[in-house]
């Protein structure tokens, strides 16, 4: 957990001349957590969904191939509900700084209480591209992580590799 120091100042509620008190300021430094109250993609629901570990059809993605990701989502709550299943990606070895988790796909599903459903996503090399130094799309071979999760702060990372041509 990251912590940042924040300066907190207080001022009198009235001007010094109108309340008859000397003008003053109090300053204190406080430690506060540096995290969002709700992570990106977080949604509210009246039931609970369990995510299985994502299964890849291959550990490596060929330059002109596609990678299929499947995971089982189960409504383990007592009510019917809807869930937005999200696929996030991270490039571990890019030559430029890349997001820690980048949303690539999402799918909304409806499940009855106790019901399960397999959700499938497909990725291609074009989904791994970013703007290079010459401002043109580039995909660099290397290691990637992906997550299938209900928000950007959840899920279990599954590695795969983009092979060179």
What residue spans do the PLM features occupy?
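Secreted, periplasmic, or luminal enzymes acting at the cell surface/secretory milieu
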Residues: 1-82, 88, 92, 145-149, ...
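Generic structural detector for well-ordered beta-strands
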Residues: 50, 55, 72, 105-112, ...
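Surface-exposed loops/turns
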Residues: 63, 113, 140-141
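Composition- and surface-driven signal marking solvent-exposed, interaction-prone regions
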Residues: 65-67, 83-87, 99-103, 133-139, ...
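Intrinsic-disorder/low-complexity, polar/charged segments enriched in Ser/Thr/Lys/Arg/Asp/Glu/Gln
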Residues: 66-68, 116-120, 155-157
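Intrinsically disordered, low-complexity Pro/Gly/Ser/Thr-rich segments with frequent PxxP/GP/PP motifs
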Residues: 95-131, 135
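Terminal connector regions
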Residues: 124-165
């Amino acid at each position: 957990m990251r912590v940042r120091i924040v300066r907190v100042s207080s001022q009198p509620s009235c001007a010094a001349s109108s309340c008859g008190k000397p003008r003053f300021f109090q300053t204190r430094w406080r430690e506060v957590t540096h995290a969002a109250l709700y992570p990106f993609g977080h949604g509210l629901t009246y039931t609970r969904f369990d995510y299985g570990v994502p299964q890849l059809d291959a550990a490596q993605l060929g330059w002109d191939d596609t990678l299929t990701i499947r995971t089982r989502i189960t409504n383990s709550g007592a009510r019917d509900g809807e869930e937005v299943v999200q696929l996030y990606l991270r490039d571990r070895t890019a030559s430029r700084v890349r997001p820690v988790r980048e949303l690539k796909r999402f799918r909304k599903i409806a499940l009855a209480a106790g019901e399960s459903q397999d959700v499938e996503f497909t990725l291609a090399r074009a989904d791994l591209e970013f703007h290079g130094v010459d401002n043109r799309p580039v995909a660099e071979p290397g290691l990637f992580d992906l997550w299938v999760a209900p928000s950007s702060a959840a899920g279990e990372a599954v590695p795969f590799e983009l092979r060179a041509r």
